[in-house]
């Protein structure tokens, strides 16, 4: 009898919990860090950033997207790691909720720069070539 009552209560409360979670998510503005492998002058970077913003908006997610540029064509890997650690430090200061990387260089450098941030936040990868 107690088990049946528990199941009825659980089934009855589950939609309320899920619905409350959706309300909370809709009200919150998420801080998103979008790391691009190249510099801001690369022709497609603006479209990538716009695509991230549009996709989140269409999904009903309010987000403030901050873009960081690694400029991987210019720097050596050691210098990229220094830049990535700075990007991670700024992300910490802005209370970033999620990191999105675009292309191999951004993801690889993020995971190997020595900063702990990518191991504490969800990381979404896109545009992996190799």
Where are these regions (language model features)?
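Short hydrophobic alpha-helices and adjacent helix-cap/hinge residues
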Residues: 2-10, 18-130
């Amino acid at each position: 009898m107690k088990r049946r009552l528990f199941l009825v209560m659980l089934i009855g409360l589950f939609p309320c919990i899920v619905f409350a979670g959706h309300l909370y998510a809709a009200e919150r503005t998420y801080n998103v860090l979008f790391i691009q492998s190249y510099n801001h002058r690369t022709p497609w970077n603006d479209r990538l950033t716009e695509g991230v913003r549009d996709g989140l908006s269409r999904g009903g997610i309010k987000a403030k997207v901050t873009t960081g540029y690694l400029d991987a064509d210019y720097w050596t890997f050691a210098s990229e790691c220094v830049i990535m650690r700075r990007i991670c430090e700024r992300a910490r200061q802005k209370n970033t909720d999620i990191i999105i990387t675009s292309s191999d260089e951004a993801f690889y450098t993020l995971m190997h720069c020595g900063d702990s941030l990518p191991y504490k936040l969800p990381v979404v990868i896109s545009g992996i070539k190799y």
